[in-house]
Amino acid sequence: MVKKQFHVLDLFSGPGGLSLGFNTAKKASLSFKSVVANDNNLNASQTFSKNNPDVEFILGDISDTKIKKKIAKSVKEKTGNQGIDVIIGGPPCKGFSLTNKMTRNMDNPMNHLVMHYLDVIKTLKPKAFVMENVPGIFAMEKGKLVDYLIEEFKKMGYTNTTSWLLNAADFGVPQIRKRAFIVGSLNKTPIEKPKPTHDSQSH
């Protein structure tokens, strides 16, 4: 059986938590490998690069056009012009927090970075994407933000786009940690919501 390896671009990578999850997720016929990552935090970049020395890390603000061009160039070089398969990332979410009603609106600059994530997807056109955020994103603009993002992704061709609220405790993490996910694929096969592997009530 030929094994397919999907190339991954990690945006707003932080020290590399999402990349670690993808790089260790394997099935008989497929695997994932992060090839390019981006964040504007120096400490995060150093940690990421130490743990992933073969991944090209672009340090800089993704809202800067020059940084976006560097990301696109690196992806092209790393994938041999084949393009990126999957884009993952968790845009900074301070403004989306359910505990901070004053910042939970699109007038807050902290909330604009999610649009740059969308812009990179539109430019690089991966086969699939995964966006992670805090649960508060579902309350943003009374749910209109998530509806808007899903609609924009569908306009790009990701008609198979959905959103979930998942609890890390349901998947073996020893703490209750709920997170929002928006996932999309160019493939028309319906995306199934992950089934819990553990009982969160035991935490």
Which residues does each PLM region occupy?
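SAM cofactor-binding core of SAM-dependent methyltransferases
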Residues: 9-65
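S-adenosyl-L-methionine-dependent DNA methyltransferase catalytic core
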Residues: 1-34, 152-155, 179-203
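N-terminal Rossmann-like NAD(P) cofactor-binding module of classical short-chain dehydrogenase/reductase
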Residues: 85-88, 130
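Conserved beta-strand scaffold positions in the cores of enzyme catalytic domains, especially
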Residues: 35-37, 57, 87, 161-165
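Short active-site-adjacent helix-start/loop capping segments
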Residues: 46, 65-68, 95-97, 139
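Glycine-rich, N-terminal phosphate-binding loop of Rossmann-like dinucleotide-binding domains
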Residues: 91
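Membrane-helix interface linkers and caps
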Residues: 61-62, 67-75
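Class I S-adenosyl-L-methionine
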Residues: 73-81, 94, 98-203
